[in-house]
A protein has these predicted regions:
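Conserved donor-nucleotide/metal-binding helix-loop-beta segment in metal-dependent transferases, i.e.
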Residues: 134-154
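Short, well-formed alpha-helical segments that are part of the catalytic scaffolds
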Residues: 46-59
Length: 217
């Protein structure tokens, strides 16, 4: 499996590793999917950011769809998304879950949804602008044009490039990446990155039902 990693602000380092091991609509899947790419954004109390980040993504020259996985945000995040769905009915989708079930399970839920709906390129991105949505086309190009199976938006290829995070969280993430690289021998600089693009075929090789998380992981 070919992994492309790049600093987005963040660079693309190339390495090759081997993988370890709804929505009701009156349209057919082929009718309403007009993009090959979907961005999964987990949310919990993101009312301050969610509309802005959706509009930025939809303002990009490359067309992306968005899937929001909302964990019952008490601040009304889901209500904002529902309002925007009226404006973007064929590009913006949401799965609402009851309770704060965790980031990891949100992505698993999103992966299953995206695979079911036949998107070719499936992205992970945070809602709080700690990932720059303007870099989504770079991730797409790394997979589509450069042949990567997975593209990682790295914060650590060229020093440390992190925004909207407290220092303690930055240090924890950085040294966690160092530890994972040391233990596994992976050549990916940012092993804890949450800004990625996967080819659908890669995720289809993984039994997502066997992946389990504890806490808000």
């Amino acid at each position: 499996m070919k992994i492309s990693t790049f600093a987005l602000g963040l660079s693309i380092e190339m390495s090759r590793i081997f993988s370890f091991s709804i929505l009701n609509s009156h349209f057919s899947i082929k009718q309403w999917i007009m993009s090959d790419s979907i961005v999964i954004i987990p949310t919990y109390n993101e009312k301050e950011n969610i509309e802005n980040i959706i509009r930025v993504v939809f303002g990009l020259e490359k067309e992306f769809h968005i899937l929001i996985i909302d964990d019952g945000s008490p601040d009304g995040t889901a209500g904002i998304v529902k309002r925007l769905q009226k404006e973007f009915p064929e590009r913006l989708f949401m799965v609402e879950r009851k309770g704060k079930l965790g980031l990891g399970t949100a992505y698993i839920c999103g992966f299953k949804w995206a695979i079911e709906h036949k998107y070719d390129f499936i992205f992970e991105m945070d809602a709080d602008f700690s990932h720059n949505p303007n870099d989504l086309p770079k991730l797409y190009a790394a997979c589509m044009e450069q042949g990567g199976d997975v593209a990682v938006g790295s914060r650590y290829c060229n020093g440390v490039n992190v925004v909207n995070w407290p220092l303690g969280r930055v240090l924890m993430s950085y040294y966690a990446s160092v530890y994972v690289r040391f233990v596994t021998g992976m050549k990916v600089q940012d092993t804890t990155a949450g800004f990625k693009c996967y080819r659908r075929e890669v995720l289809e090789t993984i039994d997502l039902d066997r992946i389990h998380f504890k806490g808000y992981a």
